[in-house]
Design a protein with these regions (language model features):
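Membrane-proximal alpha-helical signals and transmembrane carboxylates
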Residues: 2-367
Length: 367
């Protein structure tokens, strides 16, 4: 009897194992051979229609393990059009008879005419797909997203990797901001301010030369549209207050003229307070400058003062007039530090922030 029970239990265990193995194989996701692996999506608006540009991986042979190489035919760009973004994506899919798989999506490029006032509607195709990473990068293009995604760069395995590396490096070195999908999906209305990097095709790489793409501008988006542009040459100090920044280029005045030095961000403290009955943004930034020579202390003081003046100027330019351009994220800081004050003014928050004052201190040390 015990042997029969043991045999029965063993058979049930084996049968259950087969069921689990079969089920787990189906839980691993869709069969990628039946999907178009999409690395980047471009969104343009032309004559009331959405124009989608999808950069996809295309193996040279069905089911092959072809390595991704933008110089070969295994990377392809598809174009689709429609009254809505899902319709435009469906147009891309009809051209190959396969569904777009967005689990590998790394970049969403926006043409200059795209309206960001309702980000949840615009990126609804991502919200409905659980495979999309919320850390996907967002960028604007100087002209059309199609032009950018059709510019094939060959220094990385896929063109998209070049764009991501460029955005990552320039954001860390205070040459542009960085914007992720989750940053925009968290906004519920059109009154938010967002900093979106701009990718610019400077050269398409004719005559066998590598294309040149730059990420040295950042669009300040308000009410869904870019209202001005921050430039790496003029506004790099402002990017030091962003969490993506880790270093920047500073200048010190010496007898021979301006001297350029690399500075590293060592610490940043930000808070919102009420001072003398007025809203005040307090900021303490610590940076370290490298290779300042014998008069390092004097140069460091000059660098700190210069950065401080630049930040004050950027604050005055952004937080004045009728509505604030919240480039330093004061609304979120206010919501965290002074929640009751935020609730009192949340319906007219940009107008309230435009009356804020700044208390900014920059300390530059010698490495």
């Amino acid at each position: 009897m015990k042997i029969e029970r043991f045999t029965m239990a063993l058979l049930i265990f084996i049968a259950g194992s087969f069921v689990l193995l079969y089920s787990s194989s189906n839980l691993h996701g869709p069969d990628l051979r039946r999907r178009l692996l999409c690395h980047a999506v471009g969104i343009d608006v032309e004559k009331g229609e959405f124009h989608i540009t999808a950069q996809i991986f295309k193996p040279s042979q069905p089911g092959s393990d072809t390595p991704v190489d933008i110089t070969q035919t295994n990377v392809e760009v598809l174009d689709g059009r429609g009254k809505t973004i899902p319709q435009a994506i469906a147009d891309c899919e009809r051209q190959r008879g396969k569904k777009l798989f967005l689990g590998h999506l790394k970049l969403i490029c926006l043409g200059r005419n795209v309206d960001l006032s309702k980000p949840r509607d615009l990126f609804g195709f991502c919200l409905g797909d659980k495979t999309v990473c919320l850390e996907t990068d967002i960028c604007f293009c100087t002209d059309s997203a199609q032009e950018l995604l059709q510019t094939h760069m060959t220094t990385e395995m896929i063109s998209t990797e070049n764009y991501i590396n460029l955005l990552d490096y320039n954001a860390k070195t205070s040459r542009c901001a960085r914007c992720r999908l989750i940053d925009l999906l968290g906004e519920k209305d059109e009154n938010y301010t967002a900093l979106v990097p701009v990718l610019e095709v400077e050269s398409k790489g004719e005559n066998g030369k590598e294309p040149v793409v730059r990420a040295e501008k950042t669009a300040v988006v308000q009410n869904g549209k870019p209202v001005r542009t921050l430039d790496a040459q003029r506004n790099s100090e402002a990017f030091l207050l962003l969490k993506s920044s880790v270093s920047a280029v500073g200048q010190a005045q010496v007898s021979a003229g301006p001297e350029t030095v690399m500075i590293e961000k060592c610490g940043l403290e930000k808070s919102m307070t009420i001072k003398d009955g007025k809203l005040c943004f307090k900021c303490r930034l610590k940076v370290a400058a490298d290779s300042l020579g014998e008069s390092g202390g004097e140069k460091a003081e000059q660098i700190g003062k210069r950065i401080e003046e630049k930040l004050q100027a950027a604050f005055r330019e952004s937080y004045s007039g009728d509505l604030a351009q919240d480039i330093f994220g004061l609304e979120k800081q206010l919501r965290f530090d002074l929640p009751r004050v935020y609730l009192n003014y949340k319906d007219n928050i940009q107008q309230y922030l435009s009356k804020a004052k700044a208390d900014i201190e920059v300390v530059c040390m010698v490495k």
